Amino acid sequence: MDLIKEFERLIPEIKKNLEQASSLEHIEQIRVAFLGRKGQLAALMSKIPSVDTSLRPVVGETANSVKNQLTQLIHEYKTQLDFLTTTNRIQNFDAGLPGKRPWYGTLHPITIVLEEICSVFTSLGYTIATGPEVETEYHNFEALGIPSEHPARDMQDTFYISDSILLRTHTSSIQIRTMLKKQPPIAIIAPGRVYRRDSDVTHTPMFHQIEGLVVDKNISMSHLRGTLTAFLKTIFGAEIKIRFRPSFFPFTEPSAEMDISCHPCNNTGYVKNEICRICKGSGWIEILGCGMVHPKVFESVGYDHNIYSGFAFGLGVERIAMLKYHIEDLRIFFENDLRFLRQFM
């Protein structure tokens, strides 16, 4: 009958279409056209109810047979085309070409500088000390001789958790904890995160600091000067110029600040006849604070200042990194921009 012939006609027709298929996508289109819900086979099967009852079993059997053959043909052509595509891809593949290089992770520039600084001091015999970031007022302020009326203890500058608990504003608190637990001689550096309520192009609420402490008999300012000069020349190069100038810190006496010569302007204060933006025309860049440990600090930890003396210093790791890598905006360190971070691979 005519309906059976229409079913059987689908087999040579789909073969013709499959032989012309050039991609797996094209074969999928053919499958939908013949076997889809609105395809040719479905259209013919919708006519079966109108066939004479006695002929329906034969027509139904033919429809199922044709459907199975169509499915098998599609599978065979799809497998064959997939094999040919893979074979061509392999034949055209040049095994001698270099592969695509994946992006490798690397240390953050702050971590690089932090480890470099620690390496310099450990090579000089210092040990690394650590302490809690959530501190007491005693360890963070009082034991260091910072009185209650000092501006640093104001709510505007310090993150307070309670009346006497705060986020440490410097790692000097580690120095206090170390001296309370250990008798001299002491030579430590205390790296870590510290927190202050400040945020602009040169300040962030959280930053990294390294403080150092040396305590022993007959420690003098010359030991401080020699140690820090050697450190700065190792970090920035032997040609760097260094100067000490008087300063004030509650926990050291005498106190000083160290400056290094400004590299962009070569210590002149000017770049192309314009005032240097880095050093503001002075030719010098403040790099760290230091001084001899104040006798009151020794008293607070039970050391006899008539027997022992020592020096302390502190520096910001981000500031060192900014100068070392010529970065003007501190905040870029914390933006996780891969374009920036990949420069340090």
Curated annotation (Swiss-Prot):
Claim: Protein biosynthesis is one of the keywords in the record: yes
Q: Which GO terms describe its cellular component?
A: cytoplasm
GO biological process terms, alphabetically, are: phenylalanyl-tRNA aminoacylation
Note accompanying the cofactor annotation: Binds 2 magnesium ions per tetramer.
Catalytic reaction list: tRNA(Phe) + L-phenylalanine + ATP = L-phenylalanyl-tRNA(Phe) + AMP + diphosphate + H(+)
**One GO MF term attached to the UniProt entry:** magnesium ion binding
Tell me the cofactors it needs. Answer: Mg(2+)
Which superkingdom heads the taxonomic lineage of this protein's source? Bacteria
Q: Which residues are listed for Mg(2+) binding in this entry?
A: 253
Q: Please list the disulfide bridges.
A: none
Which keywords does this chain's UniProt record carry?
Aminoacyl-tRNA synthetase, ATP-binding, Cytoplasm, Ligase, Magnesium, Metal-binding, Nucleotide-binding, Protein biosynthesis
**The enzyme's E.C. designation:** 6.1.1.20
**Does the keyword section mention Aminoacyl-tRNA synthetase?**
yes
Subcellular location(s) per record: Cytoplasm
Supply the Gene3D superfamilies for this chain. Answer: Bira Bifunctional Protein, Domain 2
**Main subcellular localization, coarse class?**
cytoplasm
Subunit info? Tetramer of two alpha and two beta subunits.
HAMAP family for this protein: Phe_tRNA_synth_alpha1
PANTHER family, alphabetically? PHENYLALANINE--TRNA LIGASE, MITOCHONDRIAL, PHENYLALANYL-TRNA SYNTHETASE
Q: What's this protein's family per the entry?
A: Belongs to the class-II aminoacyl-tRNA synthetase family. Phe-tRNA synthetase alpha subunit type 1 subfamily.
Give the protein name, as stated in the record. Answer: Phenylalanine--tRNA ligase alpha subunit
Q: Which organism is it from?
A: Lawsonia intracellularis (strain PHE/MN1-00)
What phylogenetic lineage does the species belong to?
Bacteria, Pseudomonadati, Thermodesulfobacteriota, Desulfovibrionia, Desulfovibrionales
Q: What is the gene called?
A: pheS
